[in-house]
Amino acid sequence: MVGLSHYLILGSLLFAISVIGIFLNRKNVIILLMAIELMLLAVNLNFIAFSHYLNDVAGQVFVFFILTVAAAESAIGLAILVVLFRNLRTINVDDLDSLKG
């Protein structure tokens, strides 16, 4: 049977993979957004595991709200990224440091 510790180990591995992805690839904005979303999903997995272990539905409902906010965040982030790519022709983080006024 799959216990709580298995879910927590999986969540911590996903979180560690996303942190490593952020530190190893600081150039591409799309990969940074994907790593941040993976980090959020790892935390949600831990919420679900604890909620199931404690027989409490409130944690699972909270995860649905978090996923809704994460979807909106991803949509806004990708929309901003599309506008930046249209204006600057790059998605490199180093090239996005200048401001136009």
UniProtKB/Swiss-Prot annotation:
* Gene Ontology molecular functions: NADH:ubiquinone reductase (non-electrogenic) activity; quinone binding
A GO BP term, please?
ATP synthesis coupled electron transport
Please give, as recorded in its UniProt entry, the membrane topology of this protein: Multi-pass membrane protein
What's a GO cellular component annotated to this UniProt protein?
plasma membrane
Keywords, alphabetical: Cell inner membrane, Cell membrane, Membrane, NAD, Quinone, Translocase, Transmembrane, Transmembrane helix, Transport, Ubiquinone
Q: Which InterPro entries match?
A: NADH_UbQ_OxRdtase_chain4L/K (IPR001133), NUOK/Mnh_C1-like (IPR039428)
Transmembrane region positions? 4-24, 30-50, 61-81
Protein localization: Cell inner membrane
Reaction(s) catalysed by this chain's protein: a quinone + NADH + 5 H(+)(in) = a quinol + NAD(+) + 4 H(+)(out)
Pfam families for this protein: Oxidored_q2 (PF00420)
Q: What is its EC number?
A: 7.1.1.-
Which top EC class is named for this enzyme in its record? translocase
Query: Subunit comment for this entry?
Result: NDH-1 is composed of 14 different subunits. Subunits NuoA, H, J, K, L, M, N constitute the membrane sector of the complex.
Job description of the protein:
NDH-1 shuttles electrons from NADH, via FMN and iron-sulfur (Fe-S) centers, to quinones in the respiratory chain. The immediate electron acceptor for the enzyme in this species is believed to be ubiquinone. Couples the redox reaction to proton translocation (for every two electrons transferred, four hydrogen ions are translocated across the cytoplasmic membrane), and thus conserves the redox energy in a proton gradient.
Q: Which family does it belong to?
A: Belongs to the complex I subunit 4L family.
PANTHER family for this protein:
NADH DEHYDROGENASE SUBUNIT 4L-RELATED, NADH-UBIQUINONE OXIDOREDUCTASE SUBUNIT ND4L
HAMAP family given for it? NDH1_NuoK
* Name by which UniProt lists this protein: NADH-quinone oxidoreductase subunit K
Q: Which organism is it from?
A: Methylotenera mobilis (strain JLW8 / ATCC BAA-1282 / DSM 17540)
